Amino acid sequence: AAEQRRVLPSLGRAPQAVINGNEAIGLGLARGGLEAFIAYPMTPVTGLLHFMAHYAEDFGFTVVQPESELAVMLMSLGMAYAGRRAAVCTSGGGFCLMTEGFSLSGAAELPVTVVLGQRPGPSTGLPTYTSQSELHFALHAGQGEFPRLIVAPATPLEAYEWSPAVLGLSWKYQVPGVILVDKTLCEGSFSTDAGEAMSLPVYEVAAWDGASPYKRYARTDTGVSPLAFPPLPGEAVKVDSYEHDEAGLTTEDAAETVAMQEKRLGKLVQLEHEIELLPAVKVTGPAEATTALLCWGSNGPVCEE
């Protein structure tokens, strides 16, 4: 039989990778030095768990699927206590179960990176559709006040860029970070040139200088306490979900409580300065336009078009 073929014209550029948002996040986290990935499968980020498990040996990190989202969050905080950079992924319902642990991250100043894939709620909602309904949830998740970092990439390239930034900043400032995505980005495939990714600074972690006794929550000018990890001969590395003093011992003293709350919230100033150094906002279109369209996440390219 005759065979008819159509030759497509060359685009005049180098070939690009075709990847989805989940894969881009995974590659970005690996780029940022991830050491452990913990998750319980939930649409639309199940593909991320599969991707990380498939390439765990190649990238040299640990992948664990425990029994629930509660275990996911607490296991990641335990790894952070031991000095391992961990990330988790979930969707809205799973993040509901994680919120107490998310607040523990804020109180104990244990870094964790959460990939939160949005889908329509409430409750189970429409698990195979896309949504952008959980920005306020991420901003206010967890009891009490504590700093957190949230980014909402619009494309796989931005997901690849910002995932290591969240991981690094979360560790530098010892705060929880959220990569807020949705089904459209997570499971949509895009032509992507990773060579266009922004370069990131090296986010140094404040290390303990060896002065005894070790104070896990030592108050500093930046609010960031020096980190040390067990086992530490002759020293105790104590973290606490209760309000605590510099050594990590539980306290109900009013002055100490105020000082610790101000210490934690004081990190926001430094964190905001770090974000200002990065291209966190993308502006397109004519500069003389009288109307601006503000958008975030996967709606960005749609609005831009």
Give a label for each model feature:
Residues 3-32, 167-305:
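Flexible, low-complexity linker and terminal segments
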Residues 49, 99, 160-164, 304:
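Conserved strand-to-helix beginnings and helix N-cap segments that scaffold or border functional pockets
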